[in-house]
From Swiss-Prot:
Keywords: Methylation, Ribonucleoprotein, Ribosomal protein, RNA-binding, rRNA-binding, tRNA-binding
GO cellular component: small ribosomal subunit
Region Disordered: start-end pairs: 1-23
Name this protein carries in UniProt: Small ribosomal subunit protein uS12
GO biological process, one term: translation
Protein source organism: Clostridium perfringens (strain 13 / Type A)
Family assignment from sequence similarity: Belongs to the universal ribosomal protein uS12 family.
PROSITE patterns recorded: RIBOSOMAL_S12
CDD domains on file: Ribosomal_S12 (cd03368)
One Pfam family here: Ribosom_S12_S23
Subunit structure: Part of the 30S ribosomal subunit. Contacts proteins S8 and S17. May interact with IF1 in the 30S initiation complex.
Modified residues (3-methylthioaspartic acid): 89
InterPro entries, per database record: NA-bd_OB-fold, Ribosomal_uS12, Ribosomal_uS12_bac
Length: 126
């Protein structure tokens, strides 16, 4: 606990908060090109084959991004849009690919939570 005179002399240091998505450089999204598209296994106690892509961004950064939803059409050289948001059970995956933007197609036959997966509203039958 500092004294009043110590505070007058030095003041208090403000602690700068670290960014959770540093490669975005304060932008909401960034464009990038897939260099590798593969599957990986999550940490214990979970078990699955999670789809991920290594993406080279327009600012030169290379990041690992998660491909959400069931099925995807991404391959090497696909142009994708990246947003922040980590995947808790995949170490080092701190970004998500935006479905339905650029080369990434929306999830087919998705009825609920469509806006998060780039799925169009289905046609109504009369």
């Amino acid at each position: 606990m500092p004294t009043i005179s110590q505070l007058v002399r030095k003041g208090r240091k403000t602690v700068a908060s670290k960014s959770t998505a540093p490669a975005l450089k304060e932008c909401p999204q960034k464009r990038g090109v897939c260099t590798v598209v593969k599957t990986t296994t999550p940490k214990k106690p979970n078990s699955a084959l999670r789809k991920i892509a290594r993406v080279r961004l327009t600012n030169g950064y290379e990041v690992t991004a998660y491909i959400p939803g069931v099925g995807h059409n991404l391959q090497e050289h696909s142009v994708v849009l990246i947003r922040g948001g980590r995947v808790k059970d995949l170490p080092g995956v701190r970004y998500h690919i935006v479905r339905g933007a650029l080369d990434s197609a929306g999830v087919a036959n998705r009825m609920q939570g469509r806006s998060k997966y780039g799925a169009k509203k289905p046609k109504q039958k009369k």
